[in-house]
Structures are given as C-alpha cells and as structure tokens.
C-alpha cells in the first residue's frame, strides 16, 4: 500500500516550524538540506536565501513530514490559504489529546477535540505556523 508523506511550503521559517513539530512528535530529522548546499553555477542562490531550507524530513510513525522554504525569487506562499491539511490517526485517546494540545499551542482551534457525531474522538486546528491539522482516534479500531 502507498504511504502518504505530506509536504509543506514555508516563507523562511521551515526550520523553526519543524523544530516545533519535532518537540511534539519526538524523533530526529533524517535529512536537512539548505539552499546553500546546492548552490553552484547552474543553481545560483542569492545571499538572503542561503540558509533557507531546501528539504527537511521528520519521521512520524511510518511516514515522513516533509517541508521546505520557498526561495524569495519564487514569491511568497499565501499563508492565509489552505496550503494543506494534515490528518493524524492517533493510537489512543491520550495520544490524540497530547498531539492536539501540543500542536495547537499558540494556534487557533477550529473544532475542539472531543467525541464527534460520527463516532470518533476528533479535533481540528490551525497551528501557529498556519498549517491546518486534524487529529482523530477511532475507538475499537
């Protein structure tokens, strides 16, 4: 079966956001590549973009959360649009609460975590970096 690895574009704060995500999920980055690491005649990198993230990966369970900073030359990511929504299926109600509370810190809750009409324990929020998340736990699954 295919594995889905969400990828998020950032406006220069990918490293900060991923450090925050790592503080909630734990683990270690498997790969961090900066734009300056790829600089060369065929790929010139402006000085202001040298330390931006070209690629970062954080293993979570059997998947990877991937991200990068968008170089200034490509324009800004519209952070008010729904760039993505990441769904997390928790293994327990306690894990769902931990992830929901940890990731939503400093963000805005759109749907407080709790028992949903469809039978799962569910919550939805936008984190302090503008990324939308859904957390659910399905009892008996």
Enumerate the language-model features and the residues they cover.
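Glyoxalase I/VOC metalloenzyme domain signal
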Residues: 1-111, 124-141
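Short, small/polar residue-rich loop motifs at catalytic or cofactor-binding pockets
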Residues: 52, 117-120
């Amino acid at each position: 079966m295919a594995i889905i690895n969400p990828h998020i574009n950032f406006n220069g704060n990918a490293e900060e956001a991923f450090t925050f995500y790592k503080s909630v999920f734990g683990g270690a980055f498997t790969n961090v590549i900066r734009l300056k690491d790829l600089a060369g005649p065929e790929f010139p990198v402006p000085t202001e973009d040298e330390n931006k993230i070209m690629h970062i990966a954080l293993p979570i369970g059997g998947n990877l959360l991937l991200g990068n900073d968008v170089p200034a030359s490509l324009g800004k990511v519209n952070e008010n649009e729904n760039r993505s929504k990441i769904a997390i299926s928790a293994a327990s109600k306690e894990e769902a609460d931990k992830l929901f509370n940890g990731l939503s810190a400093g963000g805005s809750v759109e749907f407080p975590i709790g028992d949903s009409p469809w039978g799962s324990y569910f919550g939805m929020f936008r984190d302090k970096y503008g990324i939308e998340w859904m957390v659910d736990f399905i009892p008996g699954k």
